[in-house]
Amino acid sequence: MLVLDFINVGNGDSILVREMEGERLRFSMLVDCGHDSLERDDHPPVEDPRSCRIFAGDFLRSQGVAHLDILLVTHFHRDHIGGLGRVLETVTVGELLTPYAPPADSGPLDPDGDNGLPKAARNVLRCMDLYAGPLRRYGDRIGRIKELPGDRMECLRLTDDLTMDILFGEPALYPRQKAVYDAAFRGERNGYDLIHWGKSMNVSSLRQRLYYHGREIVLGGDAYAHMWETQTATPCDILKVPHHASLSSTTRKLLRLLQPKAAVVCVAAGRPDERPHPYIVSLLKEFTEDVHFTDAVEIPGLVEPVFHTSVHIELP
């Protein structure tokens, strides 16, 4: 049985994939680690006592997961990698799959130091520091780090019954990403390059397609619809909607290609930036009534709040 938990990390993504044989865990993978906070400074605080938000590391502990065969990072925004430290405090990892691996001797980036960089450039450094710092501190808890080149689709057989394709954006993005981050770790901090890359992070987001017993699960990361709606996409059973169901996350054209039977939106309730966007939620409901939200999202007349620590799906 394949067990999927789209964890309610509040603002962010973290998805636990497990293959079970009875009560025995055969395989486990975590895709992204959520945010380093259950709330954001620019979002209203959680006032509902029924809130079930949980850090990814704490969710793993609650499920008795002490080891991940694979930890996959889609990209380096704070709401996807901020929880890495808590995850590595909780579990050991067989293999980390990532679009960028910091140099082995890399030190802190000190994004808040007196570096003369604009705020947007500092934010890029801060996100990378939240990723690289735990790798330094807990590197002995990771068996292997594999940097994915991004120039071709990666096809992995995870178990006898479970396979995964890892899909990328434009191939030219990933050498550029490496050049910008490597320069930052060398102390060469070009504000323009950092800001420009910060605007490219979502379009570089990895996507995954899982295959299990004739079912297909698409995990869209933060990839905007226009980046992959022109590609050959086949119908899927479950779609993790890209980019928190923002207005740029999906289109009618993409949904016609994917034809999801169920959709999951990883998003915090009460966001002031229309994520999830009501139009996108309406569009999703045109294709499937089976639309789930990780947090207790409420859109009058469209979505009623549901309080849970994860959207839990089991596939025999």
Regions found by a protein language model. Name each.
Residues 1-66, 199-224:
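Conserved beta-strand hairpin/beta-sheet module of binuclear metal-dependent hydrolase folds
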Residues 1-4, 81-218, 289-316:
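Flexible, acidic/histidine-containing loops and adjacent segments that form or flank the divalent-metal
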Residues 40-42, 176-178, 227-232:
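A short, polar/proline- and glycine-enriched secondary-structure boundary/capping micro-motif
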Residues 199, 209-211, 229-231, 254-257:
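Short, conserved, surface-exposed binding loops centered on an aromatic residue
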